[in-house]
């Protein structure tokens, strides 16, 4: 997921401040996920379970979900083409899948926030972490469709503006 994020950032990073903020928030979430599962990016050594890292991950998870649902998705579409855009259909198509995905992710959050993981629950917890990783991957693939579309739209608008300016001159 980090590699795919890096590739996406190289393709669309710098095209718009909203996208840059979104990608930065995703990176923070992924780093906290890697930390909570015991992987240190760019290192081979696993780290033991730490309640503080789980708390940090759950906090980043809620922040990320909230910013997407209540800030980024529709704002990006409206900023690109306006509220009456036919491209709002893209969000209408993706939104139900994101909503279902959010419910899955929030179930993890609700289950593992303020809970102590002991030897008896460790296997279940490890499976839940694997499941949440798959849910995040699915979510990022959906969001990538929005990000790619927005970046392409902004680039096309910039080219159109440049053409207009060159025709005037």
Swiss-Prot record:
Tell where it localizes. Cytoplasm
Quick one: where is this thing mainly located? cytoplasm
Task: Choose any GO biological process term that the UniProt entry carries and state it.
Answer: regulation of DNA-templated transcription
Q: List keywords of the entry alphabetically.
A: Cytoplasm, Transcription, Transcription regulation
* Matching Pfam families: Rsd_AlgQ (PF04353)
Instruction: Look up the record and report any one GO term of the cellular component aspect.
Output: cytoplasm
Question: Its quaternary structure?
Answer: Interacts with RpoD.
Describe the task this protein carries out.
Binds RpoD and negatively regulates RpoD-mediated transcription activation by preventing the interaction between the primary sigma factor RpoD with the catalytic core of the RNA polymerase and with promoter DNA. May be involved in replacement of the RNA polymerase sigma subunit from RpoD to RpoS during the transition from exponential growth to the stationary phase.
* Name under which the protein is recorded: Regulator of sigma D
Could you tell me which species this protein originates from? Answer: Yersinia pestis
Provide the gene name from the record. rsd
């Amino acid at each position: 997921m980090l590699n795919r994020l890096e590739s996406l950032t190289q393709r669309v990073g710098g095209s718009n401040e909203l996208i840059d903020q979104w990608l930065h928030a995703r990176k923070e979430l992924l780093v906290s996920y890697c930390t909570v599962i015991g992987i240190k990016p760019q290192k081979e050594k696993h780290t033991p379970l730490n309640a503080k890292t789980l708390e940090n991950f759950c906090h980043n998870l809620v922040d990320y979900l909230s910013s997407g649902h209540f800030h980024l998705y529709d704002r990006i579409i409206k900023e690109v083409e306006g509220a009456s855009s036919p491209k709002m259909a893209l969000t209408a198509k993706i939104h139900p899948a994101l909503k279902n995905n959010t419910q899955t992710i929030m179930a993890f959050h609700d289950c593992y926030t303020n809970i102590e993981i002991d030897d008896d629950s460790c296997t279940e917890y490890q499976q839940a972490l694997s499941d949440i990783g798959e849910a995040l991957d699915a979510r990022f693939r959906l969001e990538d469709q929005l990000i790619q579309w927005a970046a392409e739209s902004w680039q096309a608008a910039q080219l159109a503006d440049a053409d207009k300016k060159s025709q005037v001159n």
